[in-house]
Each structure stands twice: as structure tokens, then as C-alpha cells.
Amino acid sequence: MSSEHIQNKLALLPDQPGCYLMKDRQGTIIYVGKAKILKNRVRSYFSGTHDSKTQRLVQEIVDFEYIVTSSNVEALLLEINLIKKHDPRFNIRLKDDKTYPFIKITNERHPRLIITRQVKKDKGKYFGPYPNVYAANEVKRILDRLYPLRKCSTLPNKVCLYYHLGQCLAPCVFDVEASKYKEMQDEIVTFLNGGYKTVKNDLMKKMQEAAENMEFEKAGEFRDQINAIETTMEKQKMTMNDFVDRDVFGYAIDKGWMCVQVFFIRQGKLIERDVSQFPFYNDADEDFLTFIGQFYQKANHIPPKEIYLPDDVDSEAVQAVVPDTKIIVPQRGNKKDLVKLAYKNAKIALNEKFMLLERNEERTVGAVERLGEAMGIPTPSRVEAFDNSNIHGTDPVSAMVTFLDGKPSKNDYRKYKIKTVEGPDDYATMREVIRRRYWRVLKEELPMPDLILIDGGKGQIDSAKDVLTNELGLDIPVAGLAKDDKHRTSQLLFGDPLEIVPLERNSQEFYLLQRMQDEVHRFAITFHRQLRSKTGFQSILDGIPGVGPGRKKKLLKHFGSMKKLKEASVEEIKEAGVPLNVAEEVHKHITAFNEKAKNTEQK
């Protein structure tokens, strides 16, 4: 769509709140945003200068749509729904992989107390989140001792051990009044909402009464329950003087990135935090609002009783997203300090991110650039490294790994079974692999490397260059990596005639070469072992009556390795889908093979 068309549409934008949807050449919605004034916000994308990430977004925009709303609040709610519907790739994508555990009282005739990571609208009562399963289990263990709700998912025909331990009322055998369950549930709710001190005081009274009545065993049980409450519920430092559940938000921005920190305060304690980092393309406060809206759309994030927000945030818009929660923008005191702490943590997290990025840049892109300078060639952004692997010439293989801008590109790794070389001949092997690889590159018009690295010396390098130049007509720099007597990367050989490229052994470019050599060696060795394992497996099975290619394949698939087959009984071999008589023959053959190998080792 022409630039003139976009300019015409920009001129028609209204001076009202709403949402806008950016589209690419295929008509796919790639970004959804909201604005208090559509005209100003949308026009800003097509005027002035932008940072690199916003520029990438703008370069892909060929059309846009907009939807006018009656208020900024309505725009936020609409934006959340549009993002959920279209999943635009430039929008914030909150990860769903981190889910926190909750304690749940199930909504059943005979309720249970369970730990779950899924919060559903099923009339159950949920408490949490807890920082981890261990913490949730500790609390549940106390509740199980105090309140004997059923433990079985389905009712058995007779009482279980929990009944004898006093931790179940055995509804499988006895009638339990609904009022009894309600009484226990109310006490559990009180306990989990911060009232555990009341429960603890009641237990202390019961312990004293039992001791006075000479019921020392019962008094000891009450004492253990009190200790469990103290160690589990009171071991965390209090952050607030009450027991209200709160989420505290703080965010920081830098270099086009936003970091949001959320502190989960439950029962007056800071139990966990959630950290999200992402690029933003809108105004920071607008994207922060969008984040909050999406945050509470996730099933495992139940809005608490209160949410604390930093200054300059549209609390009315947030209130529309979580209507049953009290929205607070603290101005002073402990509450303000918590918001500041969330901001401080967000700022630190962003600083760490950029420091790590700089460090990563230094060891990858920077190292590649300096490697090119040291070798006197253009920056080798794409490097393909080769290594051969064989044992006394058996099952010879070769492997190639690819590094793009100093990082492994595993989709571009390749494995080769050597077809034309008999016996251990590294030079001939290198010729075959280079020929096969770059003949295919030419045929399929694949990306050419800027540098080829050979794990070897002059002979391997000359073999590779001969095939490239004289057979394929290619002019690609080829270098060799030599190793010392401890099999560690020692020297980089390059040029005509070959010379040692002077590299500091503690430089990032030298470390990069080490990583390349180690990676291609690992890849080749792994492939060679897989091949040997498969052929070794099949050769041991050769000559066994009733075991042809099909059954060999079946046994290999079932056991996965020779080691497991050697340890298998006749019955276990039969489970692989072979007849009993064949399983007996296989077992007999392998037992004889093992004995022979054992005797050979002893000699």
C-alpha cells in the first residue's frame, strides 16, 4: 500500500480515544495499541526518528485500522481483547510457563484440601499463590493435621490410614453433616487469611488442658501442631502490619525496553515476585497499563484485595480491568516504599540485562569482527566448521556445525556418513565431505560461508581448498585449527603459505575458536557413537534363528541400546513383540556372547 494512502488515512484520524491495528503486506495484524488521542499517537509512528526496534515495526506497516472508544478505560479493555484475539508478534507476550501453586478447598459434597497450579471458576476456594510447592505443602501439612477433610479422590469401601491418624472423618463409612464441613472450611479460611494466631492460641489452651488432665500424649500432639505453625507461618519477615493480600507493581524503562516487577504480598508477607522484560513501542505508561490488563487475564493470576501502583498511572483504567480489587497509588509511608522497592528491582534487572547483552556482544559479534581483522579477511559472519570421526577406519563419519555472528545455528548443522573412503584416510574423507557439502550449496543456492574451519592441519586444509577451487570453482577462505598434546585448541593456521595467525590465548576471538572446535568435535563424536551403537547392536543379533531385519529393528526400537538388551530376561525380550521361542534364542545367544566377552577380558 502506498505512502500516499497512509498519509491520506493519517489526515482522517479523529481527536478521540481508541485502539489502532497495524498491518503488514499480507494483511496480518502485527501490532495493536491504544491511545487517549488516536490522531497524535498513530501519526507519531510515521514522523520523527525512532530507535531501531520501533523502526523495524514501522518498516513493516503498510496499512492500519482504528476503533474509536468512548473513554481511555474502554480503549484499554478493547486493546486487551484485541491482543488476545490476534496475538500480534510485536505486542507484549507474557510467558505462561511460570505458574504458582495454590491451596484449594474443593467444592464437593465431601470437600478436599489440594494443591493446584490451575485456577478455575468451579466454586472452589483458592488461597495463594505460594512461592513454590514446598511452601504450599508445608501449610497443607498443618491443615491436614488440624482439619480432617477427606484425602481420597474417590471414596473407598473402607476406612484408610488417615482415619486412624485422625486426619480424615471417613465419609466412605460414616455420615458427615454438611455443617461439620462448613465449620472446618470457615476455620481454614480464617487460618489462611492470617488468622492462624487465633488457631495457635486455641491449641495452646487445649495443650494446657490436656497436660492438667494428665493426657500427655494428646498434649504432645497439640505441642507439635503449635511448633509446625510457628516454623511454617511465622518464619518469614513481616512486611505489613495487617494480613491483606496485595500485589505491588513497579516498572523501569531504558533503551526502548521495559521491566515490570510485581511483588506478591500474602498474609502480610512478601512471598514471591514476578519479573517481565519486553520492548515497548507505545508510551511507557500506556504499555504498562496493557501489561497489567494482560497480567490478570492469565488464569493463574487471581487479583488480590489491593493493588499498589506507581504515580502517573491511570488507576481508573486499571480498576476497570479488576473491578473487585481496591486500586491504590501510595503517596507516603511503607506502602510507598514498597512501590519504590519494586521500581528499584526493575531498574536493577534492566541494567543487568544490558550488561549481559554487552558481554554477549563482546564474545560473539565482537569476537567475529576481531577474528576477521586478525586473519585479514572480511568479517566472517557465517562460519562452517568440519571434523571427522572414526576408530581404526570403522564407521567413518564427518560433521559440520555452523556459527552465525558467533552463535551456533543448530538448524544448519549437518552429519555425513562417509561413502567413498576405505580405511582411515582423513584427507580423502575431507575431500568427500567438502565436495558433497558445497556441491549441494551451489545446486540449492544456499548461503555461502565467509570462512571454513577445518579441525586439522596442512593436509586437511589443502584437501579442502583443492576441491573448492579446482572442482567447484569457489573462493572461500579455509583455515585449520591445530591442537596441542592435551587435545586443546592451540593454533589457527591460515594463508598461502600457511602461517600461524597471532591470537592472544585469553582473547574472545580465541575462545570463540575453542567453542567452535569443541562443538564440531562433540557433534561428530555423538554421531559416530550413535552409528556404532546401532551397527554393534545389529551385528550381535546376526545369525540368530528367527531374527531377520524386521525383528532386529523391533528389538532396537524397544530396548534402545545393547546394554539394556543384555540385561533383559526372556519375558522382557518377548515383550518387544517376538515369539517365545525367538526370545529364548536371543537370550541364549546374548548370554553366550557375554560369557565369551567376560572370559576374553580375564585372559
UniProtKB/Swiss-Prot annotation:
Compartment list: Cytoplasm
Which is a Gene Ontology cellular component entry for this protein?
excinuclease repair complex
What keywords tag this UniProt record?
Cytoplasm, DNA damage, DNA excision, DNA repair, Excision nuclease, SOS response
Coiled-coil positions? none
Tell me the InterPro entries matching this sequence: DisA/LigA_HHH, GIY-YIG_endonuc, GIY-YIG_endonuc_sf, GIY-YIG_UvrC_Cho, RuvA_2-like, UVR_dom, UVR_dom_sf, UvrABC_protein_C
Q: Which residues form the UVR domain?
A: 197-232
Q: Name one GO biological process term.
A: nucleotide-excision repair
**Which part of the chain is the GIY-YIG domain?**
15-92
Return one GO MF term: DNA binding
Pfam entry (one): UvrC_RNaseH_dom
**Description of how the protein assembles with itself and partners:** Interacts with UvrB in an incision complex.
Q: Which family does it belong to?
A: Belongs to the UvrC family.
What does this protein's UniProt record list under function?
A: The UvrABC repair system catalyzes the recognition and processing of DNA lesions. UvrC both incises the 5' and 3' sides of the lesion. The N-terminal half is responsible for the 3' incision and the C-terminal half is responsible for the 5' incision.
Name of the featured protein: UvrABC system protein C
